[in-house]
Amino acid sequence: MLYANKTVGNTSYKLSKKSMKEQTLLQKNKDLLIEIATRDVKSVFAYFKTTRDGLSMKEAQKRIQVYGRNELTSKRARIAEVMMKLSGMIPGFSKQHVRNGLQCEKITVSRVECSSVTGLNGELKMMNLPVQELVPGDMIFLSEGDTVPADVRIIYANDLLVNESVLTGNDASVEKFESCYHLERKRFIPLKRMKDYNPLELENVCFKGTYIVGGNAKAVVVSTGKNTYSGILHTCCSRTS
């Protein structure tokens, strides 16, 4: 009996440690999103060591070794099933949207190809890459019909409308801009509000799995795979389900 109680205690302790770790990851993700959202574009490029034309091919290859592929491998089938069920409960959000977000897609990316001899004279290349190959610092282009492939910071937006119902349950389209707090014309979030600020309210950030309803945008990839906002939430939900 004592052995059984000890086992239960150890299990509870391990679950508690895991829960704390997940909460820490969620907080780090939130802090990163807020920091990137409130920086100016030049500062964002400096943070990710990228340029307006994107990463070099060589650097992108290095980063995929560091960050891994942009995909969610754990409990993927269960997540897909839950999303499909939710899609039937949310008006206007079709199962096709969910399928589009889960299937292998490609996205338009700009990268720089340098001379193999000198490493200089970079040539800008526009290419369609599988979303799994995206890394932080990549420059991507979004337009109507696209599923957002990663957490991204918008640097240019043209009448951009996004459906975030997969995260919020609210089917109303949300307009996104180049600047955080565009409507209030503020650049920085007050420190006293920072702790409890909801990342989903950031007006210049789009989240992995959300859907472009209208307009177009250019954006920098902030987080990929399990490190995205939805990726961390999926991890938490998978543990509790």
Protein language model features and the residues they cover:
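Conserved cytosolic headpiece of P-type ATPases
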Residues: M1-S241
